[in-house]
């Protein structure tokens, strides 16, 4: 059965059962904390959290998902994929356990001719949570599943939560037995290679409290509305129904492998593991890259763009290592389109753009590889010739800085050459470069440090600023500069990611140049007449010698020639947001002085669309009441709809009027004054502002903090950003109130009660944990091993034991071992990934040269930690839990040598 048919049957099955088919969300959501959508239920989270009311009681979808943390494992095993499809059915307060089990079982076991998948019921198993007898009953009732094919499992396997307070509940997983050729019998508990999970049914029935792990949280009580969230792995089902061992053999990925195998001199599945890995990398990454590009991402150096760039570059390099020297990306993207577009038609509709972006990255990276590979080979040879096994940080930095090699590529190439890389040295050099770049950027922003190139234009006279009266102005290009050098013409290069600093100097401009805390306007410059095809985005505007406007641009089409007439146009939405932020800053300043008094003097500010930051001289933090008063006074002034107007006057007259000036700032003899509401606010200011205070919109103070001795900072949102912030907080409060089952006004008291209960529970847990450890200590003393004439207790204790508890326990155990030479070494997995360990040595063992402070060093080396102490008692802590057994073995070996 083809994968598209598997997907279609899933949706058809649930639509017939009264579910609404919900299309897959984009893999890119408007959430900065989520790089890519990585689970089928992500788009439904607001409904499960009670933040939004679902428009349906039942829904079904097949979601595109991307997971890239294990990108380096792709291809090495057949289990890891960066893209997968998760089919899911969801119930929002409608059916529950019985319905979920019945729907899943019916689809899996119904004959193919009846619309099902036709799985043999005798080869299906289920797992349930330890005490979920209800689910067991339904598996027997609905599916006729015998008890011997239903296994109970703990919280780590069969209890679901989102990792934060909110809905949680037991889950039930469905497994398929692939047969004895894949491993021993005994169900999922015995062998998950033979028994492969294909569907997970989550029964959201409880609320969970705080906790830091999958198991460390309190179950608070039942949910008012029980929900269902399920996930069926489409690719896993495809493997089983197509009779293949892994997803790379399915109809989704095998075509890409076959494409490359028809070109490469070495084939797939010929017994060369490294080649097979490269084939699988190409197949997996090409599909994921096409999906990401299709959802609007372009290759870049940060975030999602960087992930995409890395995927594409790994494809290209894997192909090179297989002996494919010619471009291959265009054909790969076409192969992905053919395989995936039956399910995702947007891949066909937007194919030209997807292919163009992928091919452009291939072309650019081929140049990078050609120039950088020789340097890497030379550096690797020199490293080995010197007897070293680690490529220097300087070499890795040069590859990155000069040839564009990402560090991950250098790491891969080094590993293939049996070398490691000095990553710490590389990152130190990168940090130095960033610092230099920051300093250079600051110099360029402050004054275009080298004015010689601009001197002629500076001497010719200032740019006429028209932005107080209009947002679009016709202007003449006085000069064009690329990286500080004057040129007669600049054109669109067609090269993505060009880094040249291109600036236009115009005789007049509506763009506000960054100054006075207000960031520069953004917008466009377009050609006129014969140059009407010329268009550029204005991304920044800086002043040169305080008189000349330098417009930083990205040329998008055509060419600009010195002397041309152009139209400079400010983005009106950007300007409106900037004026809201700047006027809001004046309002907050006035409110601060009204609440705190005249000593609250401005020390600096920053305002941009929707946001303001205001620094002022003040000793000590503001009280909550002062913050509330400042916010209230500001919003009262907004509501008053004060008129905002500006005028120019002599500096002395402005000061006599009471206009506020920034201390230490040099002002000309004639200054611009901005007045809001008569006496409410009067400041010297050259920035852009709203026409009335009501246009600022609501002002929400986000916080107040210290930024230096005697200087405090207030940050706030204004306008729509303020509304969005308040709406988000309201939704969070509603979610909390819903989760806690109390009205919003009672949330603080309820939280305080829960915190107190949690503390009491933690104390009781600590008591029980220590009691259990003491019991284990008694048994440990009785079972001490004899190494030479030294009795040794070297034991791993239960997780969660603190260093203080271990010290108490080693003393108790040592006391039970008598006066013969004895050593006690205890180690445990503590909180926050720590690994505490303690060693105690009695006097008789010390007489034989055994010292506790020496033994903790041995243990520390095994767990990436260190310790110290005295001859009789020493302790330490590490971070490598994987080394605990090695630490205990090292102690035994050390005692054996004593």
Swiss-Prot record:
* GO MF terms held by the record: alanine-tRNA ligase activity; aminoacyl-tRNA deacylase activity; ATP binding; tRNA binding; zinc ion binding
One Gene Ontology CC term in the entry: cytosol
Positions of Zn(2+) binding = 582, 586, 685, 689
Among Gene3D superfamilies, the record links this protein to: 2.40.30.130, 3.10.310.40, 3.30.54.20, 6.10.250.550, Bira Bifunctional Protein, Domain 2 (3.30.930.10), Threonyl-trna Synthetase, Chain A, domain 2 (3.30.980.10)
A single Pfam family, by name?
Answer: tRNA-synt_2c
* Subcellular localization: Cytoplasm
Keywords in alphabetical order, please. Answer: Aminoacyl-tRNA synthetase, ATP-binding, Cytoplasm, Ligase, Metal-binding, Nucleotide-binding, Protein biosynthesis, RNA-binding, tRNA-binding, Zinc
PROSITE patterns, per the entry:
AA_TRNA_LIGASE_II_ALA (PS50860)
Q: One of this protein's GO BP terms?
A: alanyl-tRNA aminoacylation
Keyword Ligase in record: yes
Q: Which reaction(s) are listed as its catalytic activity?
A: tRNA(Ala) + L-alanine + ATP = L-alanyl-tRNA(Ala) + AMP + diphosphate
- What cofactor is needed? Zn(2+)
Organism superkingdom: Bacteria
Sorted alphabetically, which SUPFAM superfamilies does this protein's record hold?
A: Class II aaRS and biotin synthetases (SSF55681), Putative anticodon-binding domain of alanyl-tRNA synthetase (AlaRS) (SSF101353), ThrRS/AlaRS common domain (SSF55186), Translation proteins (SSF50447)
**Primary location:** cytoplasm
**InterPro entries recorded:** aa-tRNA-synth_II/BPL/LPL (IPR045864), Ala-tRNA-lgiase_IIc (IPR002318), Ala-tRNA-ligase_IIc_anticod-bd (IPR018162), Ala-tRNA-synth_IIc_core (IPR018165), Ala-tRNA-synth_IIc_N (IPR018164), Ala-tRNA_ligase (IPR050058), Ala_tRNA_ligase_euk/bac (IPR023033), DHHA1_dom (IPR003156)
Cofactor detail note = Binds 1 zinc ion per subunit.
> What HAMAP family is this protein classified in?
Ala_tRNA_synth_B
What NCBIfam families does the annotation carry? alaS (TIGR00344)
Description of its domains: Consists of three domains; the N-terminal catalytic domain, the editing domain and the C-terminal C-Ala domain. The editing domain removes incorrectly charged amino acids, while the C-Ala domain, along with tRNA(Ala), serves as a bridge to cooperatively bring together the editing and aminoacylation centers thus stimulating deacylation of misacylated tRNAs.
Its biological function? Answer: Catalyzes the attachment of alanine to tRNA(Ala) in a two-step reaction: alanine is first activated by ATP to form Ala-AMP and then transferred to the acceptor end of tRNA(Ala). Also edits incorrectly charged Ser-tRNA(Ala) and Gly-tRNA(Ala) via its editing domain.
What family is reported?
A: Belongs to the class-II aminoacyl-tRNA synthetase family.
This protein is called: Alanine--tRNA ligase
């Amino acid at each position: 059965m083809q994968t598209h048919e598997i997907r279609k049957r899933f949706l058809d099955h649930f639509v017939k059962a009264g579910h609404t088919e919900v299309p897959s969300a984009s893999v890119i959501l408007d959430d900065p904390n989520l790089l890519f959508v990585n689970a089928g239920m992500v788009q439904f989270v607001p409904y499960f959290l009670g933040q939004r009311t679902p428009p349906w009681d039942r829904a079904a979808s097949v979601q595109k998902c991307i997971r890239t943390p294990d990108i380096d494992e792709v291809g090495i095993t057949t289990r890891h994929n960066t893209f997968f499809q998760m089919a899911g059915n969801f119930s929002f307060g409608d059916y529950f356990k019985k319905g979920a089990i019945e729907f899943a079982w019916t689809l899996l076991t119904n004959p193919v001719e009846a619309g099902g998948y036709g799985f043999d019921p005798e080869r299906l198993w289920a797992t349930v949570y330890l005490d979920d007898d209800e689910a067991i009953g339904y598996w027997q009732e609905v599916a006729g599943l015998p008890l011997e094919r239903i296994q109970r499992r703990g919280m780590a396997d069969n209890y679901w939560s989102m990792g934060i307070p909110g809905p949680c509940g037991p889950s039930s997983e469905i497994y398929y037995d692939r047969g004895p050729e894949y491993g021993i019998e005994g169900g999922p508990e015995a062998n998950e290679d033979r028994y492969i999970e294909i569907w997970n049914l989550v029964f959201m029935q409880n609320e969970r409290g705080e906790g830091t792990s999958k198991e460390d949280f309190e179950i608070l009580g039942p949910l008012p509305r029980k929900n269902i969230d399920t996930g069926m792995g489409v690719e896993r089902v495809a493997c089983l129904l197509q009779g293949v061992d892994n997803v790379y053999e399915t109809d989704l990925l095998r075509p890409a492998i076959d494409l490359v195998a028809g070109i490469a001199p070495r084939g797939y599945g010929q017994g060369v593991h490294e080649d097979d890995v490269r084939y699988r990398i190409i197949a997996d990454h090409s599909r994921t890259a096409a999906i990401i590009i299709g959802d609007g991402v372009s290759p870049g150096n940060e975030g999602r763009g960087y992930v995409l760039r890395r995927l594409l570059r790994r494809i290209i390099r894997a192909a090179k290592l297989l002996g494919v020297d010619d471009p291959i990306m265009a054909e790969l993207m076409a192969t992905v389109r053919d395989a995936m577009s039956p399910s995702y038609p947007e891949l066909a509709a937007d194919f030209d753009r997807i292919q163009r972006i992928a091919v452009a990255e291939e072309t650019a990276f081929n140049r990078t590889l050609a120039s950088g590979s020789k340097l890497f080979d030379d550096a690797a040879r020199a490293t080995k010739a010197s007897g070293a096994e680690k490529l220097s940080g300087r070499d890795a930095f040069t590859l990155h800085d000069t040839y564009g090699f990402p560090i991950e590529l250098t790491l891969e190439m080094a590993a293939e050459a049996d070398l490691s890389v000095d990553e710490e040295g590389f990152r130190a050099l990168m940090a130095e470069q960033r610092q230099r770049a920051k300093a250079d950027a600051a110099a360029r922003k402050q004054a275009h440090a080298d004015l010689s190139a601009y001197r002629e234009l500076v001497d010719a006279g200032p740019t006429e600023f028209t932005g107080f009266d209009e947002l679009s102005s016709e202007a003449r290009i006085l000069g064009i500069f690329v990286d500080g050098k004057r040129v007669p013409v600049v054109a669109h290069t067609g090269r993505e990611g060009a880094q040249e600093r291109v600036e236009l100097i115009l005789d007049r401009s509506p763009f506000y140049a960054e100054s006075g805390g207000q960031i520069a306007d953004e917008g466009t410059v377009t050609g006129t007449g014969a140059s009407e095809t010329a268009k550029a985005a204005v991304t920044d505007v800086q002043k040169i010698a305080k008189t000349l406007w330098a417009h930083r641009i990205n040329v998008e089409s055509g060419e600009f020639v010195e002397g041309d007439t152009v139209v400079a146009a400010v983005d009106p939405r950007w300007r409106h947001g900037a004026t809201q932020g700047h006027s809001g800053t004046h309002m907050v300043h006035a409110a601060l002085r009204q609440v705190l008094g005249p000593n609250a003097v401005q020390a600096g500010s920053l305002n941009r669309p929707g946001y303001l930051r205001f620094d002022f001289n003040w000793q000590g933090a503001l009280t909550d009441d002062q913050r509330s008063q400042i916010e209230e006074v500001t919003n009262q002034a907004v509501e008053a709809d004060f008129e905002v107007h500006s005028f120019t006057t002599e500096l002395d007259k402005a000061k006599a009027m009471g206009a506020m000036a920034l201390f230490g700032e040099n002002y000309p003899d004639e200054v611009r004054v901005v007045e809001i509401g008569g006496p409410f606010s009067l400041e010297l200011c050259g920035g852009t502002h709203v026409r009335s205070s009501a246009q600022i919109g609501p002002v929400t103070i986000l916080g107040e903090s210290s930024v230096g001795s005697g200087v405090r900072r207030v940050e706030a949102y204004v306008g729509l950003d303020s509304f969005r912030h308040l709406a988000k907080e309201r939704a969070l409060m509603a979610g909390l109130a819903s989760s806690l089952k109390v009205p919003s006004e009672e949330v603080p008291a309820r939280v305080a009660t829960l915190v107190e209960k949690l503390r009491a529970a933690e104390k009781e847990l600590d008591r029980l944990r220590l009691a259990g450890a003491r019991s284990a200590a008694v048994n440990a003393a009785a079972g001490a091993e004899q190494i030479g004439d030294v009795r040794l207790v070297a034991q791993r204790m239960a997780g969660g034991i603190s260093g203080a508890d271990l010290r108490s326990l080693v003393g108790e155990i040592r006391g039970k071992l008598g006066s013969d030479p004895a050593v006690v070494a205890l180690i445990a997995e503590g909180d926050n990934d720590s690994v505490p360990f303690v060693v105690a040595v009695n006097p008789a063992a010390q007489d034989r040269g055994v010292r506790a402070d020496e033994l903790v060093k041995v243990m520390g080396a095994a767990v990436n930690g260190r310790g110290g102490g005295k001859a009789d008692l020493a302790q330490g802590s590490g971070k490598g839990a994987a080394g605990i057994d090695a630490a205990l073995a090292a102690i035994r070996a050390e005692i054996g040598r004593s």
